[in-house]
Amino acid sequence: MIHELSVLGWIKVFRHSTKNKEFFSNKQDALNKNPDKPEADLFSILDKLEDFRSSDGRFQFKLCYPEATFKSGKSCNEWIQSSNPTQSDVITDFKPVDLAFTEESYGKPWSGLGRATVGGGALIDDSPKQTHWRSAVGVFNKYYVDRFPGPLELKLQSWPRLVEMFVKKS
């Protein structure tokens, strides 16, 4: 999948695997970690997102849970938004492209990612101004043994151990 995505212009900007029970140490750590090792358990170049903003001011993202399959039969959400999720807790100009999972933390329609300002467990999530933090990216609060909060559709026992995030190179 990684090769296929890179051929199609997608750049991996984040990877978190808990196979070795590792978590980021804090929000700053989740912004940049092992920048030259995209297959590392903890990899992030989220601090470089602005480099991938398109000429029309938007980002096209893909958030993938490779070990999960949702009702759609897919494991990734693809969408466009104008807000940088590492900088803003307000998600703006959300446009779905192809959604595998469709509900955010509170059961409302999934509408992108923003910088978490409440909840205290991850850098970004799908309901950044609320206490629940699903679709979490940059988890530094070891929440459940070797797993972290994924999409609402996943129950606690099937929470993910792997998440990857990509941005489309314009």
Residue ranges and their predicted role:
Residues M1-S170:
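Mature extracellular or lumenal effector domains of secreted proteins
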